[in-house]
């Protein structure tokens, strides 16, 4: 399942590590970890800023994928169980 790939990038084949899907999975994992951190440390403003930067980057990648290939976009959104920007 793709949810586990964000934790272990070594499971992704070498030729697919730069793909949009793998980047979104990686960023989703980072977002989850930062969200857990911010639940404990709510006033950590530098982490909040980093979280917003990562969320923006993931959003841009999802918009790119939506424009290029909607089937891959819908598949990725379904596998990660998240709402897309569109």
UniProtKB/Swiss-Prot annotation:
Q: Where are the transmembrane segments?
A: none
A GO MF label: structural constituent of ribosome
Which keywords, in A-to-Z order, does the entry hold? Chloroplast, Plastid, Ribonucleoprotein, Ribosomal protein
- GO term, biological process aspect, one: translation
Disulphide-bridged cysteine pairs = none
Major site of localization recorded for this protein: plastid
Q: Which domain of life is it from?
A: Eukaryota
PROSITE patterns per UniProt? RIBOSOMAL_S15
Which cellular components does GO assign to this protein? chloroplast; ribonucleoprotein complex; ribosome
Subcellular compartments? Plastid, Chloroplast
Q: Return the Gene3D superfamilies for the record.
A: S15/NS1, RNA-binding (1.10.287.10)
The UniProt subunit note reads as follows: Part of the 30S ribosomal subunit.
Q: What is this protein called?
A: Small ribosomal subunit protein uS15c
Organism field: Cryptomeria japonica
